[in-house]
A protein has these predicted regions:
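Small-molecule kinase domains that catalyze NTP-dependent phosphoryl transfer to phosphate-bearing small molecules
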Residues: 101, 119-120, 143-188
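ATP-dependent NMP and nucleoside kinases share a basic, alpha-helical "lid"
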Residues: 94-98, 104-140
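Short, high-confidence coil segments that cap the C-terminus of an alpha-helix
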Residues: 7-8, 101-103
């Protein structure tokens, strides 16, 4: 599948857990881009009866927190779910890209590189947060360091993501990230 659409510029946006992807996506929307979130698409898919039946069959639950607990502790279950859900997310993402009224579309995909989705976009941006801010970010998400580390293990290391990214947006805080995205949009005359 290809997410590229004629007369649109598709940016894949990614980063590790708690890197500021969602914040970056909000800034891109603020500065004029159409935005999509793979996590939001997944949440909508999980509401569909057919998907709920499949989740119940494989994982015994449809509760998001219980699903997360299982897939982050059982790699086989995570892989099975990813193989099932990723094509559906991409199909819905492509539909939304085609419907977008704006030429610039930023698609936040946490596993952009891991799922080889970076080959389906025009440009890929990696969001990297200052590691010194991790304790504050954990507190803001009400996430323990143990859960954070378990989830981080399911993603590629930042250095591997950086090697495949076209642009790396390193930031110290939300204000810094917003300023960098604004400059990026201005530089490319995207809003």
């Amino acid at each position: 599948m290809n997410l590229r659409v004629k007369n649109k510029w598709i940016i894949g946006l990614t980063g590790t857990i708690l890197s500021g992807k969602s914040t970056a996506l909000a800034y891109f929307a603020k500065y004029g881009a159409a935005t999509l979130s793979a996590d939001e698409i997944v949440a909508q898919l999980y509401k569909k009866t057919a998907i709920q039946k499949q989740l119940k069959k494989w994982l015994g639950t449809t509760q998001k927190d219980q699903i997360a607990k299982q897939i982050f502790t059982h790699p086989g279950k995570r892989k099975q779910l990813e193989n099932f859900i990723h094509p559906l997310v991409l199909k819905e993402g492509l539909k939304q890209i085609k419907q977008a009224k704006k030429k610039l579309v930023v698609f936040e995909i946490p596993l952009l590189f891991e799922a080889d989705c970076d080959k389906m976009t025009d440009l890929n941006i990696l969001v990297v947060a200052d590691p010194k801010t991790l304790p504050l970010r954990l507190k803001g998400r009400q996430m323990s360091r143990a859960i954070y580390k378990a989830r981080l293990k399911t993603q590629w290391p930042e250095v591997e993501k950086a090697a495949r990214a076209d642009i790396i947006l390193f930031h110290k805080n939300k204000k810094d990230l917003g300023a960098k995205i604004k400059r990026f949009c201005e530089a490319f005359d995207l809003f």
